């Protein structure tokens, strides 16, 4: 939300389709008013497209480019990956081109988001200033399918797949202005001289006899892993 608002201050709806989930944010008066999420199934997300691209022998990028030249996108519905796989196989048997299958899958992602997550009565219900983000929207075929389905234009940032990280950075920057303090991150010189030693020990403080990995840093502070209790 912070990233989208920085790029489009009047944003009133955000759709984020990532690799495994769909997030929809309704904005009112500059604040998040409502949030919609997809169910446990990851169908209709980026991994869904990537899976079928691999099955058909294409990279995700090439599969997306091919879909832009579809003349008759296949109607594949918006079912889960298992059922969609059979639909794609049937489309291949019927002679559908890879371009039309790619476009059909992109449309199914959009329909899944619209009719199973957002469920608007009409396009105007979403808002007038819509930002779409998440790695899935780097696929121009998905972007175009969304715009055609709603018959409107939306804003897709060039860093669509990094909007979460960008928003976190903006938030950290703002917090630093309010509460100035030195960063806990190591500086470049500290990284160049960074060193630590590792040793393995067996703890004898209880009957678990945990095999521990002990990292000891230059300042003498240890970091212990491998324990099965809270003793270390």
Regions found by a protein language model. Give the residues of each.
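Glycine-rich phosphate-binding loop plus the immediately following alpha-helix
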Residues: 5-7, 29-72, 170, 174, ...
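Adenine-nucleotide phosphate-binding core of ATP-dependent small-molecule kinases
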Residues: 86-115
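Active-site nucleophile and cofactor-binding loops and adjacent substrate-binding regions
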Residues: 1, 15-19, 36-44, 104-107, ...
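Acidic, glycine/GT-rich loop-and beta-edge segments that sit at the periphery of enzyme/chaperone cores
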Residues: 23, 174-232
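Glycine-rich phosphate-binding/hydrolytic loop that grips phosphoryl groups
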Residues: 2, 46-51, 158-186
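Glycine-rich phosphate-binding loops at beta-strand->alpha-helix junctions
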Residues: 108, 121-149, 160-161
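Phosphate/pyrophosphate-binding loops at sites that engage ATP/ADP/AMP, CoA/4′-phosphopantetheine
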Residues: 8, 113-126
